[in-house]
Amino acid sequence: DFVEDGAKLAISEMIKSGTTCYADMYFFPTVSAAIAREVGVRSQIGFPVFDESSGRSADSYIHEGLKLHDSCKNQLLTKTAFAIDSLNMLDSETLSLIATYANELDLPIRIRLHENASEKSVSVNRFGSRPLERLIELGMLQPQTQLAHMIKIDDHDIQLLKNNGCHIIACPESNLKLDNGFCPIEELLLHGINVGLGTESSACNTSLDLLGGIKIVNLLTKGFSKDSSFFDGHQSLQMATLNGAKALNWQDEIGSLESGKFADFIAIDIRNIDCFPTANMASAIVYGSSGSDVSHCWVGGKALMENSELKTIRESDLVNITQKWSQKLSLARSTVKGNRNL
């Protein structure tokens, strides 16, 4: 119930703020996939692989995920990917198995990587190589690989990323909130590396408003580059749309409005005063608008929101869900506090 309700809340928030497709990696991926299809949003569901410290073997996670992959083969709305929360927690045998399946089935591999300063030293001490070097050794750094965060990287790392054609998902709001640093987007783009934009989870970021995050990544990138002309509004919007589709290996079907692609698009109410002036529309959207300005959302030509009203899920149900879990969590906190006082 927790994952099902959380998925409903998160998907609703994303639709309300203009997201038509998202990538996910969490427990019970079959539940998340079912909710996404029920609501009608497009998704790439990552099935997580953990080590035995989670109470289950890595093999069981892999085979459960492959069952989900098989069930989604003919789904237009849902794709799947391997998802690795911590590279340092998995042994090389497990990672090699993931690489083998990924190559055989043409499955993407999504990895949270270089999210903090200790990852490199832990990898070197435990496995004898840096994280990216280890991925290369195991055949996991390839054009199907999605690396989220990548904030603690140097010139050597950037060259490895370029040489192997993988994709970066920058999550600046989460990184800043947790005081972890900032992905060197300018350097990555200058080296021709594809960078998409993400929000991270509500646990790390609180907000899933990707449109609002575009402004933050734009201003930070300009600030670090010390060049106000670098990374303009159009480039910023592309990072949140087509670049993201490329990272998911979905660019032939989504990411831009073109003949032959799915009709996934949104409408932004530019009559709102925060969007003025509109002489440069890309600039108005990036610097003046936020997710609250989105009025309509379509996925595959189907309306998921019209005039700011969700069409495939009842907002009254969402209110009930939040109230239910608020009460449960409050009770749990009170119980824990009471036990500590015994």
What are these language model-derived features?
Residues 117-129, 155-162, 179-188, 205-222:
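Histidine/acidic-residue-rich catalytic or RNA/ligand-binding cores of hydrolases
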Residues 137-144, 186-272, 288-289:
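His/Asp/Glu-enriched, well-ordered alpha-helical/loop segment
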